Amino acid sequence: MSSEKEPNWNLGCNLLLTAVLVGVALLYFSVKNAYNHTLQPGQSVTIRVRPNTDQVEYSSELILEKKDDKKIKLSGRDVWSEQFSGLYLEVKEKKIIQLGNSGNDDTELPNNQQDIQLVEDGIVVSYLGKKVFDVTSSKPYNITVTNVDDKPASFYTQVVNR
């Protein structure tokens, strides 16, 4: 009798193991693809920034990894800054400021940078690769990413709260 139950038990364990592995794989790919975007010309995606204000010191970062050199516009902030670069893009004042080593050596740069330009309501980026932007705020808000190129644009985004 035990020999008849053993194949059924093995079959059940194999099916359960297969179902768990397939479920984990589906979960992994669905989470991974949630941050990958391909936008057609003119299309937008909204990214929600929810700062962790319960902490004494908090910060939020936007990780933007562009998979091509197509132009996308980031809007939703008055000041954009690339982390650890000392570069501040002030949208309302239409200024690009490069901070100096000491606090007094700030330099205003022309709006003709190779991979980041100021526009009326945000910045347009056209670099290839990964950059991290400081998007810290005391209240939740939205960042809108719009494809302003004439071809599809692919990129990865993630907001990280520290």
Question: Which role fits each region the language model picked out?
Answer:
Residues 4-162:
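Acidic, Ser/Thr/Pro
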